[in-house]
Curated annotation (Swiss-Prot):
Keywords: Metal-binding, Stress response, Zinc, Zinc-finger. Zn(2+) 1 binds at residues 177, 180, 198, 201. May be involved in environmental stress response. Induction: By cold, dehydration and salt stress. PANTHER family: AN1-TYPE ZINC FINGER PROTEIN, ZINC FINGER A20 AND AN1 DOMAIN-CONTAINING STRESS-ASSOCIATED PROTEIN 3. Transmembrane segments: none annotated. A zinc finger (AN1-type) spans 171-217. The gene is SAP14. This is Zinc finger AN1 domain-containing stress-associated protein 14. The lineage of its organism: Eukaryota, Viridiplantae, Streptophyta, Embryophyta, Tracheophyta. Residues 1-31 are annotated as: Disordered. InterPro entries: AN1-like_Znf, AN1_A20_ZnFinger, Znf_AN1. Pfam families: zf-AN1. Coiled coil: none annotated. GO terms for molecular function: zinc ion binding.
């Protein structure tokens, strides 16, 4: 319940003002026209104060963020490993994509750019140098294979040439008897006259052998028993 008391501050020394209860104290309510003036003044005063307080709060928040970031940056240093790995992977993927694009352009007949062609030339040079080093360090299997093929081809050519040009004294085939022409295979008998015969014609009197066994026997005996001639010694007395 409001109480009545004199309030000379309201411009009415003889009047009384209503006291409105307020938490922590009480004050006399001003007249309506003064209430409007006070409301406008308070609004004008509060507006700049609110903007300045908002600016101050924003500045304080930014300062706190900087200090917070600086503290964590000091406490835990920034780890660039994952960043570098990501950058390296992205660069490698980009280079692979560039190589594929250049290959497609080359296949399509479009000349690649100068930088791309220079990079391709550098890679080709490095591959040639690396291949040369490897070839010097370890011989290539293809080289040995080519040498073996060349040698086998040369041997086959020699064999074909020798078979196509027989000797003047043509001999009968080795797997047939020279008299009856029967196949003897590996069981044939080789005579000193140079022919191959079967078991029935292996002897000299059966196939009319022209080899002189007596002359060869004498030569063999002469070689095995050389004649030793002693020199006469003249003794002087």
């Amino acid at each position: 319940m409001a109480t009545k008391r004199k309030c000379p501050a309201n411009g009415d020394d003889g009047g009384v003002a209503d006291l409105e209860p307020v938490a922590g104290g009480s004050f006399a309510s001003p007249p309506p026209e003064k209430k409007a003036k006070l409301t406008v003044a308070v609004a004008v005063a509060v507006a700049p104060s609110s903007s300045s307080s908002a600016t101050t709060a924003a500045a304080g928040e930014a300062t706190a963020k900087r200090e917070h970031g600086g503290f964590f940056a000091f406490a835990r240093p920034e780890n660039n490993t994952r960043l570098s790995v990501a950058v390296a992977s992205s660069s490698s993927s980009a280079s692979a994509a560039a190589e594929k694009a250049m290959a497609k352009l080359t296949v399509a007949g479009v000349a690649p750019s100068s930088s791309a062609s220079a990079a391709a030339a550098g890679k080709a040079t490095a591959k040639r140098e690396y291949g040369g080093f490897c070839a010097f360090a370890r011989p290539d299997d293809k080289t040995r294979w080519r040498v073996a093929v060349a040698s086998s081809a040369a041997a086959a050519a020699d064999a074909s040439y020798s078979s196509s040009s027989p000797a003047t004294g043509e001999q009968p085939e080795a797997n047939r008897c020279a008299t009856c022409r029967r196949k003897v295979g590996l069981t044939g008998f080789k005579c000193r006259c140079g022919g191959t015969f079967c078991g029935g014609h292996r002897y000299a009197d059966e196939h009319g052998c022209g080899f002189d066994y007596k002359s060869s026997g004498r030569e063999l005996i002469a070689k095995q028993n050389p004649v030793v001639v002693a020199d006469k010694l003249a003794f002087r007395i």
